[in-house]
Amino acid sequence: MITHLVWFRQDLRLHDNLALAAACRNSSARVLALYIATPRQWATHNMSPRQAELINAQLNGLQIALAEKGIPLLFREVDDFVASVEIVKQVCAENSVTHLFYNYQYEVNERARDVEVERALRNVVCEGFDDSVILPPGAVMTGNHEMYKVFTPFKNAWLKRLREGMPECVAAPKVRSSGSIEPAPSITLNYPRQSFDTAHFPVEEKAAIAQLRQFCQNGAGEYEQQRDFPAVEGTSRLSASLATGGLSPRQCLHRLLAEQPQVLEGGPGSVWLNELIWREFYRHLMTYYPSLCKHRPFIAWTDRVQWQSNPAHLKAWQEGKTGYPIVDAAMRQLNSTGWMHNRLRMITASFLVKDLLIDWREGERYFMSQLIDGDLAANNGGWQWAASTGTDAAPYFRIFNPITQGEKFDREGEFIRQWLPELRDVPGKAVHEPWKWAEKTGVTLDYPQPIVDHKEARLRTLAAYEEARKGA
């Protein structure tokens, strides 16, 4: 008997799952599914408890959905990726598996694991798929067959390549000829988990698809005007579903095209498409420069920046107690919800690196430990952009002023007051510099003074980068 095994990883869905669709194409084959939890590996990679809770819920939904199609989901748990190789080998042997199907992961540890799996399964046909991207790594290259290092040329080449051949979405599998089966007992991951707002981050696949449709219909066209203001619900909130594979980027692209037909010509929705292309850019980069997975800066000389070791400042930043309201409100949103608005990710990252002169890798690590949408490529790309260590990053002398950033993107302080109740009585725009208002009025606030002077911090950071740049 032909037996196909689908190995689920970061692709926890039925619709538009390339590996699952390929495994189910042969109607006479027996199809099994496998998921391997690796708690120690997840801890090493700083996976957040909220993301673990999302994965746990998605796994149980997937198990039920697969059972309705007649496909049993086998759940296994081992410490790490190395141990998972033996599990795949064991499951294949126990079930006389003839073909293994899986979707590629581009991180360095995951790629090494997959090489070992294929090496171990000499009598099993292994098929991998570029499922987590719209265009696979290698499809968008320079004229010299090199990876683009600047986003705008990559974007232009990506769009040109897309117009030459639009990747289609594949349908969810039909019920196997054997009929539906009873699902196995519910899955419980052996990893710290924390609840989250399912209204913002849906668990069920159909709910994620509905959220995508609603955003593309009602939000994508206004995204350019609303995306920078954290007090406004102007972003898609789809990042968590993309990070765990509850949605595919192809689903996002096709729904966007359906609702905003002029998007490829720069019409409504094109700025949100730009964000999808940034996601592709960072994934392609990570494939060609695996050192990015090892917390190495893309620009070599920036590794010589003399970072400050200041646990008190790092803790103040993590807890939202720096004395700069827009930074603190953003960090408290992250700690409370597991999510942070993208504009605020830039502001808080810039503050940690360029006001506190703390190593960007500390921030990268902390974000991953809190984010429900934690994604190595996107998170690393964002931090290296803010720290001026990455490819096509902000220049090192670009340093956000945390006061003017608050005034620009939360003018009346609506977002700040939502997350900093101790400042709710500070009127109007005074909320951006509450220490001045407190001194003027004689009111004592239960809120810290700024832990650094921005002007002095800026000069210190410029000097540190310029010193590191010598000899570059």
Positions of predicted regions on the chain:
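Glycine/tryptophan-enriched, flexible segments
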Residues: 145-299, 409-410, 414-472
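Active-site-proximal binding-pocket segments
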Residues: 233-422
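Short coil/turn segments at secondary-structure junctions
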Residues: 46, 314, 445-448
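A broad detector of short, well-ordered amphipathic alpha-helices
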Residues: 21, 90, 206, 328, ...
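Trp/Phe/Arg-rich N-terminal binding region typifying the photolyase-homology
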Residues: 1-166, 268, 463-468, 472
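An N-terminal domain-cap segment
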Residues: 6, 14-15, 229, 321, ...
